[in-house]
């Protein structure tokens, strides 16, 4: 969908509907991707956000019903090339992925993708010094939140909540179970009802996050997801028709 090719760029408050591909941080470091809506609508090849390079921050995004996997997962971390040429893939380092909501995606999180044509995958460089924290993941039945996890990766998981999925394997440290969000907003977001106890209070792993996808926070703490239920009306919404300019 978008291929970033330089450093320090920001992608925010966009709505992607049934788009084949991903928002890919292809070249460049220290980019921010936040406050975006990705609606796959069950269309083949729809993806989310792919990380390549150093120092990226991906937060407060809503990703739902995406049918892509591997490099077109909802959120994926690319394997890097040793001594990568400018046209290659640089190792993912120091990324923070936090406060995202991932709903009913074929492949929610994939860590260590893109090794199909590598010849010897063991020579590729895994993501290191990364954090995945305070994300809410509602999995499809029988599918785990981590669709792929390169065993060499250095990624710390903290405060993530997972609904549904599979009982075949226990959740890793840094992920625990929760109830699935069941209410639908006018623009198509699945969320917890106001009467439902809010998801757990977030850990302090992304101190740079001061608002949420709908607008400024309505309290002194953050919930584990891209939004926060409160009495404060949101100021941002996903586009709901081709002529809307609310985002």
What does each model-identified segment do?
Residues 1-179:
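Glycine- and acidic/polar-rich repeat regions and solenoidal domains
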Residues 171-247:
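Surface beta-loop-beta hairpin patches that serve as ligand-binding interfaces in beta-rich domains
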């Amino acid at each position: 969908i978008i291929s970033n090719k330089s450093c320090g760029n920001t992608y925010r408050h966009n709505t992607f509907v049934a788009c084949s591909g991903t928002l890919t941080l292809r070249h460049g470091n220290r980019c921010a991707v936040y406050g975006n809506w990705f609606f796959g609508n069950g269309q083949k090849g729809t993806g989310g956000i792919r990380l390549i390079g150093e120092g990226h921050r991906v937060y407060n995004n809503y990703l739902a019903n995406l049918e892509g996997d591997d490099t077109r997962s909802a959120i994926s971390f690319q394997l890097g090339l040793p001594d990568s040429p400018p046209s290659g893939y640089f190792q993912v380092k120091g990324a923070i992925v936090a406060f995202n909501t991932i709903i009913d995606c074929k492949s929610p999180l994939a860590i260590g993708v893109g090794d199909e044509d590598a010849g010897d995958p063991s020579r590729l460089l895994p993501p290191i010094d990364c954090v995945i924290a305070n994300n809410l993941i509602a999995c499809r039945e029988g599918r785990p939140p981590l669709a792929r996890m390169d065993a060499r990766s250095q990624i710390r998981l903290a405060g993530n909540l997972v609904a549904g999925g599979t009982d075949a394997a226990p959740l890793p440290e840094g992920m625990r179970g929760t109830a699935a969000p069941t209410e639908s907003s006018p623009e198509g977001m699945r969320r917890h009802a106001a009467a439902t106890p809010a998801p757990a209070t977030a850990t302090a792993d992304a101190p740079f996050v001061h608002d949420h996808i709908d607008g400024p926070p309505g309290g002194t703490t953050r919930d584990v997801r891209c939004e926060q239920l409160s009495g404060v009306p949101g100021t941002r919404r996903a586009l709901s028709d081709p002529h809307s300019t609310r985002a």
